[in-house]
């Protein structure tokens, strides 16, 4: 079908052709147009105008403050949207990076009250002020820097309070020591010879299971002793040698005189009772004196450590921990002289006072030591990525060439706390002299080989003399992480509350403390009078 319109528009002629599918031709004067082309052109421009209208409306809603009345301006504004990016997309990050990279001092933030305190405050202020990229970056930097400063201060305060809590003697323990010392002076039953005269030969009899506990904490020692004897299948074969210092000897003797653990044999001795320690110069005492002098000069005290604003909080925590009295305690170094302290014994199990024994330990004597001296649990393998990820590089400073050329940073570390020592094999080595040689080297280097603890020199001294034992015998970390599973801890032979959260402190983890507290007798008159809680 064709449609013809006369030039004068007086008549229209319809000619039947090939139907509607043919082109419709319009004649106006001498011109001829395709009606289909006109139709599709109008349709295209209709959609284009609608699209432009929608984009310009969205731009207005987004809050673009710049007016745009010309088509050229509108084109500039719509071009980035059509292309899917802004024209200055490369400049915005660049401007932000420049602002963020500029250092911001603490003084610039001091006394400022206009810095947003929360993310919600920050977003509200940015929307209200309609900030550009630089202003946005500046406000963001100020807020994050302020939060970092506050977080750092809070962390350091936490570490300082934990240091004070873990290093100080709780008044309950002080009370217990005083009451027992008084009891020792007025009550003959608190001054018994330990052990009784007829049991003294068993102290050097290698047919018995000999355990050594060095502690100046009466409450902790009582829990270790009670848990050891209660869980032993043959308690009559147990001999526990308790070593303490001069000031704690009388209270410790009073406690175990009034709280016997028969049929086990308990010996309580002070360091000054050992002839070996009272004759001539003792390396451990000399090393401790030097160590104390160097630490006092090197550290400067907790106030100096905390006042350092440039130090990482984790480093601050490590330095505070190094100030702990236990690292300069003779009780902590005494294990290196076990062969001299017990010259008649061939094998002993050395126990720390922050452990709890949950099973019979006599099978430890059946472990084949393969000629090695120290039976210990390794601490580089296990599900706990914090406690069981320790290698030599975790304790020793391998940036020091002396350490780097002598040891392998990837070598697996092991733990103190519950160790089987073959004293007969030990006496054939130079372990003790090696220990003191490296202690002296560390002091000469201003503690640059390692910074705290007796384990680092122990790792060096016992290097090549360690027999790995099953992790079942010694579970660590109960004083470090609250995430430790109670069920896992309950199934271990020995649980070790190494770390600051000792079970006798208020900062102990509540769900783990019952493992230790169940060996306290809440009805005991000394425990009750000093308000020592079992839970």
Swiss-Prot record:
This protein's pathway: Glycan metabolism; pectin biosynthesis
GO biological process: cell wall organization; glucuronoxylan biosynthetic process; glucuronoxylan metabolic process; pectin biosynthetic process; xylan biosynthetic process
Cell compartments where the protein resides: Golgi apparatus membrane
Record's bilayer topology term: Single-pass type II membrane protein
Listed transmembrane segments: 38-58
Residues in the Lumenal compartment per record: 59-535
UniProt cross-references to Gene3D superfamilies, sorted A to Z: Spore Coat Polysaccharide Biosynthesis Protein SpsA, Chain A
GO CC, any one term: Golgi apparatus
Glycan-modified residues: 397, 430
Signal peptide: none
Entry EC no(s): 2.4.1.-
Family membership noted in the UniProt record: Belongs to the glycosyltransferase 8 family.
The protein's name in its UniProt record: Probable galacturonosyltransferase 12
Source organism of the structure: Arabidopsis thaliana (Mouse-ear cress)
